[in-house]
Design a protein with these regions (language model features):
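Long amphipathic all-alpha helical oligomerization modules
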Residues: 60-158
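Membrane-proximal, non-transmembrane interface segments of integral membrane proteins
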Residues: 1-71
Length: 158
């Protein structure tokens, strides 16, 4: 579409929009790969399921234990397992938000695609093209923020 436009402001906006769209698609791909890695991580999934029961078992053992040095060790195990559970729950929350952002981005990509087709069909004015370009930049920035947050949280947890 941008190549078919005559040189000028609209052409420049469309070219810039296409570059931003490329970044957007790259971020969508990175986000999808990160989600796929998370969902395929058997250790994380196993720990998410096992930790509540492990904590309960350790707390039950603590109630039955009389030796103070063993009780101290059990308390440390419980604290460690609770911290691990909290970190995994935070990771799970981030991943759920990322999944919603991915879904939102894919929907927005479909919208942008149809807007580009409208641009071509109607040869709309520069103001609308500027608005579309800004929408794309905003979506790219939002998705980049999610990917960066996921990189930080996922990298810190594993």
């Amino acid at each position: 579409i941008a190549r078919r436009q005559e040189e000028g402001i609209l052409h420049d906006y469309l070219e810039n929009s296409l570059l931003a769209l490329t970044d957007w698609i790259a971020n969508v791909f990175r986000l999808a790969k990160r989600l796929e890695a998370y969902e395929g991580d058997a250790v994380l999934q196993r720990d998410l399921k096992a930790l509540p029961k492990d904590i309960q078992n350790a707390e039950a053992r603590l109630r039955l234990e009389n030796d103070e040095s063993v009780r101290r060790e059990i308390r440390q195990v419980i604290a460690s397992k609770k911290a691990q559970k909290q970190n995994l729950e935070q990771l799970q929350d981030v991943m759920e938000k990322a999944e919603m952002q991915l879904e939102n981005s894919l929907t927005a990509l479909g919208t942008v695609y149809s807007q580009f087709l409208l641009l071509d069909a109607k040869k709309i004015d520069d103001a609308r093209a500027r608005g579309l370009a800004q929408d794309i930049r905003d979506e790219v920035d939002a998705l980049q923020n999610v990917v960066t947050t996921m990189d930080e949280v996922y990298g810190r947890t594993i």
